[in-house]
Regions:
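N-terminal loops that bind phosphate or other acidic moieties
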Residues: 2-354
Length: 354
């Protein structure tokens, strides 16, 4: 993929008529109007994406992008990069947190080595390595233009393959030590936010280490003049291969017209990048949960998305998105199988203009 090819991608808008039809069917179910709350909008959105009132999200997968980040050299994380490889290995045998959740939720886990700093071929993990991790953005740009484009293209291609394999809804996940630093750097630069206001402790930092993390991010933003840069340049300079790959997943889902669930802050940053690079991609995105990471709130506000879950989660791997898939299944149970007012021989609730 070239930059010109990325810039030329056009996302088709959703058809309002399908959204309205699903909402009308929801209103005909024997329950209070909007009784399922936010889920009614999400169900109607999925219907508009699928262009049907007979919604199906039975075949599900979570794409987990695994990659290392050179900025870990700056001691911005409690753990070293060896943890990325260890967790990826666990994912390959469904022994990580997302694997256990996905087994309960009926979701297939597809872990992807898009940039782990290792020469190992990891059993159960798709080998799609663009590079063995990024460079330390405190010293030099994290990626080349070619690496970013390859990672985005990889994400798009993975979605296309999932579509061919019959998957009806996808979730996004990631694993990469240091990626709360990269994601916060991207969000702060892209949304022109104060670094201290959107930087969290990640997997656990002391107050002193948090200050160092903020300093590393702020210095990089200033060094590369990122507050005046475009989204692609920001991603290339302080982002990660996992973020770039997930950006491709969101773009690919919009191209293939498949609903895709956002997980926490790292995938939320990728969602923001996807919408910035390819306007309209957000219409195919389903928010899941409010992350403990501070930047996520600002991103959701910018995307005009409203996460359903508020459980103070910060686990990563796609776990929040997988939980959201379970809740969508439950809500769809009412939509697909719920009795109508006619079944009960009672009058349907009417909507009145407010």
């Amino acid at each position: 993929m070239t930059k010109a090819e990325l810039d030329s991608i056009k996302i088709l808008p959703l058809e309002d008529s399908w959204y309205r039809r699903v909402k009308e069917k929801l209103d005909g179910i024997a329950k209070p109007l909007d009784g399922l709350g936010k889920f009614e909008h999400l169900i109607a959105q999925i219907g508009a994406i699928e262009k049907t009132t007979r919604i199906s999200i039975q075949k599900k997968a979570v794409l987990v992008m695994c990659a290392d980040n050179g900025v870990v050299e700056e001691q911005v994380s409690q753990s070293g990069k060896e943890v990325t490889l260890a967790v990826a290995k666990a994912m390959g045998v469904n022994n990580s947190s997302v694997g256990k959740m996905a087994a309960v939720a009926g979701v297939d886990v597809i872990p992807v080595d898009i940039g782990i700093d290792t020469d190992e071929v990891i059993p159960g993990v798709l080998p799609r390595k663009v590079a063995k991790g990024t460079k330390n953005f405190a010293k030099e740009p994290a990626m080349t233009e070619e690496e970013v484009l390859k990672a985005i293209e990889t994400g798009i291609q993975l979605v296309q393959q999932c579509h061919r394999d019959g998957y009806e809804i996808l979730a996004t996940g990631e694993m990469g030590i240091g990626n709360t630093t990269t994601s916060t750097a991207v969000a702060a630069a892209l949304l022109d936010l104060e670094v201290e206001q959107v930087t969290g402790k990640g997997a656990g930092l002391t107050d002193e280490a948090l200050k160092r993390k903020c300093r590393v991010i702020e210095e990089a933003i200033e060094k590369y003049s990122l507050r005046d840069a475009d989204a692609f340049t920001i991603l290339k300079t302080v982002g990660g291969l996992d973020i770039a790959g997930l950006t491709g997943v969101f773009i690919g889902a919009a191209i293939e017209q498949i609903p895709v669930v956002i997980d926490g802050v790292i995938s939320a940053v990728a969602a923001l990048l996807a919408e910035t690079l390819c306007k309209g991609a957000v219409n195919y995105m389903i928010p899941s949960h409010k992350s403990r990471e501070l930047a996520e709130t600002a991103i959701m506000k910018n995307l005009h998305l409203d996460p359903v879950l508020d459980a103070d989660m910060a686990l990563g791997e796609g776990t929040g998105a997988v939980m959201m898939m379970s809740l969508l299944d439950v809500a769809l149970g009412v939509y697909l199988q719920g009795a109508s007012f006619a079944n009960f021989e009672i009058e349907q609730y009417k909507r009145y203009e407010e």
